[in-house]
Design a protein with these regions (language model features):
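Catalytic cores of secreted/periplasmic lytic hydrolases that degrade extracellular macromolecules
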Residues: 14-18, 22-23, 34-106, 117-243
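His-Asp-centered metal-binding catalytic motifs of divalent-metal-dependent phosphohydrolases/nucleases
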Residues: 111-115
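SH3/SH3-like beta-barrel superfamily modules
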Residues: 249
C-alpha cells in the first residue's frame, strides 16, 4: 500500500510543479504591492515610475524600463563625490540590475547611502563591497569577503527577498521593531539595517532624485505590453520587443 501511495505522489509531481512555481514567484514579490500600471517582460516586472505610488513604498523588485547608462552617469556626476568611475558607472549598474533583479535606482541609492559610492568606511578596503552587505555591526570587516557584484546579488536574494525587505519603508519599520524588541524574525524576517534614524527614507529620497533626473534628461520609453505566445525567428527581435513609440524601421 505504501508503495502505491509513493507511485501516486510521484505521478502527480509534474502536475503540481506549475502551482509550486507560481507560489514561489508570488512569495518573492510579497511585501510590496505592484500597481496596475505594471508590465512583465522576460520575468522582469516594470512600472512607469513606482509600483505603489512613491519611492518609499515601492517594491524594489520592480523596475523602470529603458534607463540608459548615460543617464545614470549624468546623475552620478551631480552628486559631488570623487568616486571611482571604473568601479561604479552606468554600464556596471545596468549589469548589476540584470544579474540581481534589484531595481537599478535602489542599487544606486544603497551604494550612495551605505558608503558614498564606495568612498567611505569598509567599502574602501580591497575586495569589500559598497553596499554594506556582510558588514555586521559586530564585524564590519566581514564585508571584505563580498565584492560589489557578488554582494548586490546576495543582498537581493537574502536581504530583500529572503528576509522580506522589499520596500525601504518596510526596512525602516523593521529596524524600529528590532529596537523596541517587538520584531518577530520568524514572521517578519530579519532586518536590512539596524539604524532607526530613517535610513530607508533617505534611500527612497535618492531613488526619487534619480527618477526625476531621468525625467529631465530624456526620460524612458514605456515598457512593451506583456504578450503571450510570441515567437523569435532566428533569434532576432520581434515587434513586441519594441517600446511604444518606436518601430523596427
Amino acid at each position: 500500500m505504501k508503495k502505491i501511495k509513493w507511485i501516486l505522489i510521484l505521478g502527480l509531481l509534474p502536475l503540481l510543479m506549475p502551482v509550486l512555481v507560481i507560489l514561489i514567484l508570488a512569495s518573492a514579490m510579497a511585501g510590496g504591492s505592484i500597481g496596475g500600471n505594471s508590465s512583465v517582460q522576460k520575468g522582469v516586472t516594470y512600472s512607469e515610475h513606482w509600483s505603489n505610488g512613491d519611492a518609499y513604498t515601492h517594491n524594489l523588485l520592480v523596475h523602470r524600463y529603458g534607463i540608459k547608462a548615460s543617464q545614470l552617469d549624468g546623475f552620478l556626476k551631480t552628486l559631488g563625490i570623487n568616486y571611482d568611475s571604473s568601479r561604479i558607472n552606468g554600464e556596471k549598474l545596468l549589469e548589476w540590475e540584470a544579474k540581481s533583479n534589484l531595481d537599478i535606482r535602489a542599487i544606486l541609492a544603497i551604494a550612495l547611502n551605505e558608503s558614498s559610492l564606495g568612498t567611505a568606511g569598509v567599502a574602501t578596503n580591497p575586495g569589500a563591497n559598497m553596499f554594506g552587505y556582510g558588514a555586521f555591526d559586530s564585524n564590519p570587516e566581514n564585508a571584505n569577503n563580498f565584492n560589489d557584484e557578488v554582494a548586490v546579488v546576495a543582498l537581493t536574494q537574502q536581504t530583500i527577498i529572503g528576509n522580506k525587505n522589499q520596500t525601504f519603508k518596510i526596512q525602516d519599520d523593521k529596524a524600529k521593531k528590532l529596537a523596541s524588541g517587538t520584531l518577530n524574525t520568524t514572521v517578519d524576517g530579519g532586518v536590512s539595517f539596524t539604524d532607526t534614524s530613517g535610513s530607508g527614507k533617505r534611500r527612497a529620497e535618492t531613488m526619487q532624485k534619480l527618477d526625476t533626473y531621468i525625467d529631465e534628461n530624456g526620460g524612458t520609453p514605456k515598457a512593451p505590453k506583456q504578450t503571450a505566445g510570441k515567437t523569435r525567428d532566428g533569434g532576432g527581435i520581434t515587434s513586441s520587443d519594441i517600446p511604444e513609440g518606436y518601430s523596427l524601421t
